[in-house]
Design a protein with these regions (language model features):
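Transmembrane alpha-helices of multi-pass small-molecule transport proteins
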Residues: 6, 27, 51-99, 178-182, ...
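Hydrophobic/small/kink-forming positions within alpha-helical transmembrane segments
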Residues: 35-40, 70, 94, 98-102, ...
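Transmembrane alpha-helical segments that form core, pore/gating elements
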Residues: 43-46, 54, 69, 161-221, ...
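Hydrophobic transmembrane alpha-helices of multi-pass small-molecule transport proteins
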Residues: 142-158, 281-300
Length: 309
């Protein structure tokens, strides 16, 4: 199958920019799918950064995603990107996310995985707070409860014992705040532009911001590394499309708790790839994380029934 046929088939499965019967449920489904793919992407990156500089990984990943956008849209992509009303906020978002990634990877060098994971997952809480301030979303008790239950699940699963205030802790928290801010900006821009145009703008900025460092620290990948690099491009590209389109369909405060599901995927992939056997606290935390998602699903279903009555 030719690349353009594959992209057309995938895009046709997503009603990009068109109304759907149940947008919130559709947004939730896309968000969970997107975070699952990004967890797989992170696993591939973890294998790559042992030998390939992270700048090069981000640069090549963005090149692959941008190429996919060109194949899907064609030559008109340049004109649509230049005329897009969301160019400025997407540039700001790209800069915030790049700083967030640098902060996260820097913190991960000095903190245990459990510690950096727990700190980073403050992002859904920050995102929900920002959604009430910036987007004027009305956050229900059920949504706040879901965010709180999900974060408790993360803490129990990660078990960050003995965590103290330090520079790496600050970096991890900074990553969480910047990521949450980026997601709020994504919701704001998602209502005014198609997902693949936003993806193109975002990845053009990442190419420009990582290109110099990638060239200066370039390492020619082996065949195995090239396969992993292609994998990261595919996972990140489809994952971005799912998250961007999910944000078009549902409010930030609804989708925020589902970011925690990536931790469940992470534990599963950790077992399959590295043989990391989850402990009992991991299963308890996973149950709480899944419960947070169910709280949102059932509360939104009840809200729809009440509105229809």
């Amino acid at each position: 199958m030719r690349p353009e046929r594959f992209l057309d088939c995938f895009a046709s499965a997503l009603p990009l920019g068109t109304p759907v019967k149940n947008p919130i449920s559709y947004g939730i489904l896309l968000t969970v799918f997107g975070y699952m793919l990004f967890t797989a992407h992170d696993s591939a990156v973890k294998l790559l950064v042992v030998t390939i500089p992270v700048w090069q990984v981000l640069f090549l990943r963005s090149c692959a995603i941008l190429a996919g956008c060109f194949v899907y849209e064609g030559p008109s992509l340049v004109r649509k990107v230049a005329r897009s009303p969301v160019v400025k906020p997407m540039i700001i978002r790209s800069m915030l996310l790049l700083i967030a990634w640098i902060s996260y990877y820097s913190a991960a060098k000095y903190l245990q995985l459990a510690e950096v994971t727990t700190l980073y997952y403050a992002a859904p809480i920050v995102g929900t707070i920002l959604a009430t301030i910036v987007l004027r979303e009305k956050v229900t008790v059920a949504r706040w409860t879901a965010v709180g239950v999900g974060f408790c699940g993360v803490v129990i699963a990660s078990n960050p014992v003995g965590l103290s205030i330090s520079w790496p802790v600050y970096l991890a928290l900074q990553a969480a705040v910047l990521w949450a801010t980026g997601m709020v900006l994504l919701r704001k821009t998602a209502l005014h532009e198609k997902s693949h145009i936003q993806m193109a703008v975002s990845n053009i900025m990442l190419i420009l911001m990582t290109g110099t460092m990638a060239i200066l620290h370039w390492k020619t990948p082996t065949g195995y590394e090239l396969i992993l690099l292609c994998t990261t491009g595919i996972f990140a590209g489809i994952g971005q499309l799912a998250l961007f389109e999910g944000m078009r369909q549902a409010p930030v405060s609804v989708l925020a708790p589902f970011e925690y599901t990536s931790l469940v995927w992470a534990f599963g992939l950790g077992y399959l790839i590295w043989g990391d056997v989850p402990k009992i606290n991991t299963f308890i935390g996973a149950i709480l994380i899944l419960s947070a998602g169910l709280i949102i699903i059932f509360s939104e279903r009840r809200r729809r029934r009440t509105a229809a009555a």
